[in-house]
Amino acid sequence: MRNVMIVVEYDGTNYHGWQYQKNAVTVQEVLQKAIKKVTGEEVNLIGASRTDTGVHALYQVANFKTNTKIPAEKLPYALNSVLPDDIVVVQAKDVEDSFHARYSAKRKRYKYIILNRKFQMPTMRNYCWHISYPLNIEEMKKAASYLIGTHDFSAFKASGSSKTSTIRTVYDLTIEKNEDFINIEIEANGFLYNMVRIIVGTLSYVGLGKIKEDEVYDILKSKDRTKAGITAPPQGLYLIKIIY
């Protein structure tokens, strides 16, 4: 039996996240059905990151066990011929049997896009968070620096998380302005439930002057979710890299 790894890009707008749900359409379910059409096999597709409803992926990694004889390099063509236009397999390769898309991952990187201008941009409404008041980028950058390193991120975790440990290491957190857009990228060894979106929401409060930049350190140390900012909406979030 082979262990096949695939790299997937998707527009999360029309999906209830990655993970299979009984009464909703998810990315995992659509991909598993496509694999069955192509190989004739029911597979258990393991994703590196269980993205939420409306969240996008420019680099999602998944793996599945299969007996198919289709060469790995032909699989993307076969799968894309039966997949909808908003899910694309860009790479497939055979990997060792022990490879697990989720548990073998060492780091994950996300990008969050904010549109910071007076009016919404209709063509981007499903792909960014519109904030109409000007954000102070320099203050946001100062606040972000407190979050780099190994910390207890309980203050940036939504309720409903099944993870027991709340300690995570953030290796990189950058904020760049590109005309009307603000791009926030964060890389860590793992993320708690809604952690990226709560960090973005908190940094937006700093940018708006609702929270002082040095208060972010106090919020982090408090381990109290109620002290942090709002949870940023899902449509601005992109999974952009999995590092093994």
UniProtKB/Swiss-Prot annotation:
Alphabetical list of InterPro entries matching this protein: PsdUridine_synth_cat_dom_sf (IPR020103), PsdUridine_synth_TruA (IPR001406), PsdUridine_synth_TruA_a/b_dom (IPR020097), PsdUridine_synth_TruA_C (IPR020095), TruA/RsuA/RluB/E/F_N (IPR020094)
Quaternary structure (record): Homodimer.
Residues annotated as signal peptide: none
Residue numbers binding substrate: 110
Name under which the protein is recorded: tRNA pseudouridine synthase A
Keywords, in A-Z order: Isomerase, tRNA processing
Key word tRNA processing present: yes
